[in-house]
Structures are given as structure tokens and as C-alpha cells.
Amino acid sequence: MQVDEQRLRFRDAMASLAAAVNIVTTAGHAGRCGITATAVCSVTDTPPSVMVCINANSAMNPVFQGNGRLCINVLNHEQELMARHFVGMTGMAMEERFHQPCWQNGPLGQPVLNGALASLEGEISEVQTIGTHLVYLVAIKNIILSQEGHGLIYFKRRFHPVRLEMEAPV
């Protein structure tokens, strides 16, 4: 199998991996930006740590690294349009994305999305280059949880809501 064919088959296989949709944001002396990401996962709960992967060619990497902090906003099913803004599907400029009324600053000064299922603010403790991506290891310092909302996932190159079914009484 040639390298290009294997790369395409790998991408098709990864499209079958349903993943939570997140907007990863940062703000500080290096600037403010955010990106929609599905390559986000927990590493350990002691100490709370998360891994975030961003394409190495992204112009946002110097901003994330320069600020040294970020926030992972786990989107609810009603926030698909915001996900589309931050992936660049709508043509909305970066600063305009943050002028929406749904943003506030968290305790670490990071952009927190109101209504997100969870917002995890943390400090970037390590950055590794692996192939085409930078892998950020983030030490979580502040967690905001929402009691409302259903999930939003990305599966087969499309957004899908994930709704909790009501449990039948036992």
C-alpha cells in the first residue's frame, strides 16, 4: 500500500471514531484565538490532565504556546453553529467569534463558553511534535460543569447531537 493511500484509509478509519466536539480557546499577551477540535482526551485524573492535538501548520500554535494557558469547552448539542465558526466553515473572523454574547473569562482569564457541557481551564505543561500535529499536555486548574444539555459529536465527517434517553423506572 502506498503512503498516500494508507494516509487516506487512515483518515477514513478515523472518521468512524465518534468524538466529542470542543472549542479550545486561549487568551493572553500573545493574543486570543480558538479552534474546534475533536482530538482531545483525558490523560489522568491525578493530577487532572488533558491532551489536545492541533495541526502543526495552524497559525494558532504560537498564540497557544505564547499564552501558556487554554480552555477546553465541551460543546452541547445546541452549539453546532459555534463549532462551525471556530473550524472556519462560516467565514466569521476570529475576533468576531469572541464578540458573541456567550463568552466570559474564566478564573484563569481564558475564554469560557457559556452553556458548554464542561469548560476546563489549564496550563500547558508540555508540547510534543508527533508527525503533522502538536500534542499539548494540559494541567487542568479550573473546571466548570453544566447540569443541562446533551452532547455534540463528530462522526463520519458530520456533526451529530447525542441525546440522553430518559431511563425507565425500575
From Swiss-Prot:
GO MF term set: flavin reductase (NADH) activity; FMN binding; NAD binding; oxidoreductase activity, acting on NAD(P)H; riboflavin reductase (NADPH) activity
Keywords tagged on the record: Aromatic hydrocarbons catabolism, Flavoprotein, FMN, NAD, Oxidoreductase
InterPro entries recorded: Flavin_Rdtase-like_dom, HPA_mOase_red, NADH-dep_flavin_reductase, Split_barrel_FMN-bd
Gene3D superfamilies: Electron Transport, Fmn-binding Protein, Chain A (2.30.110.10)
Pathway membership, UniProt: Aromatic compound metabolism; 4-hydroxyphenylacetate degradation; pyruvate and succinate semialdehyde from 4-hydroxyphenylacetate: step 1/7
Enzymatic reactions: a reduced flavin + NAD(+) = an oxidized flavin + NADH + 2 H(+)
Record has Oxidoreductase as a keyword: yes
EC number: 1.5.1.36
GO biological process: benzene-containing compound metabolic process; pyrimidine nucleobase catabolic process
Described purpose of this protein according to its UniProt entry: Catalyzes the reduction of free flavins (FMN, FAD and riboflavin) by NADH. Subsequently, the reduced flavins diffuse to the large HpaB component or to other electron acceptors such as cytochrome c and Fe(3+) ion.
Family: Belongs to the non-flavoprotein flavin reductase family. HpaC subfamily.
Subunit comment: Homodimer. 4-HPA 3-monooxygenase consists of a reductase component HpaC and an oxygenase component HpaB.
Listed name of the protein: 4-hydroxyphenylacetate 3-monooxygenase reductase component
Species annotation: Salmonella typhi
Top-level taxonomy: Bacteria, Pseudomonadati, Pseudomonadota, Gammaproteobacteria, Enterobacterales
